[in-house]
Amino acid sequence: MSHFKIVFLTSLSLALVFELFNTISVPITSHLFISEYNGYKFGVFGWCKVDGSICSPIRMGYSLDDILLFNDNEYLHLPNHAKYALSKLLLVHVLSFVCVLVFWLFAILICIKWLNTSKSVLLFAVGWSMVTFMVSLLGFLIDVLMFASHVTWSSWLMLVSAFFVALSGILLCLMIRDLSYRRFVKLQGEVDVCVPMTEPRDPDELNEIWKKKTSKREIL
């Protein structure tokens, strides 16, 4: 069981770190970005020029007005202009990070109080792992939808994060099964019930058998 816990927590910790890489992308940090295209780096909360000289304000979604404020001769280009409105869907990255963080906190609580954790809490954690997996996978699909072949390794980490979340959910199901067996063995040890292998006979019948055996011994 200790090996299951180690792999369980390690998988979720890696998923949390990978989600963090996408969440703190440009313009929060200059080295992490989900796409690079036409001299610009794009992140969840905005964009920056490759040289870092100009960055957009930190907000959800991209806008042509950001560039026009700095230089009327430059325009912000995405792979497809129709995708400016879709840039607000990058909020899914933040939602995915929050979901993984909650799942990670659940994992720590479950591993610390393993034998005393109620079954309803464990089942809720399994359900939450499914939600977290779908949100993480959705974040990766949104990156591909917006930036196509221009996605960077940071976006691919979202797919890896979804894999680790799915692995953690499977391990949690195996741990619940093992916990149910441990509780059954513990309950069986506390309640010692003797079950007869055959149906007990009538007392009068047993007395007759005893008399016959004693009479045979007297004859001998």
Curated annotation (Swiss-Prot):
Where does the sequence pass through the membrane? 6-26, 90-110, 122-142, 156-176
What cellular component GO annotations does this protein have?
A: cell division site; growing cell tip; plasma membrane
Which is one Pfam family of this protein?
SUR7
* Membrane topology reported for the UniProt record: Multi-pass membrane protein
Which ranges of this chain reside in the Cytoplasmic compartment per its record? 1-5, 111-121, 177-220
Show which residues sit on the Extracellular side of the membrane: 27-89, 143-155
Q: What is its main location?
A: membrane
What are the alphabetically sorted keywords of the record? Cell membrane, Membrane, Transmembrane, Transmembrane helix
Query: Where can this protein be found?
Result: Cell membrane
Q: Record's family?
A: Belongs to the palI/RIM9 family.
PANTHER family per UniProt: PROTEIN DCV1-RELATED
Q: What does this protein do?
A: Required for the proteolytic cleavage of the transcription factor RIM101 in response to alkaline ambient pH.
Specify the protein name: pH-response regulator palI/RIM9 homolog 1
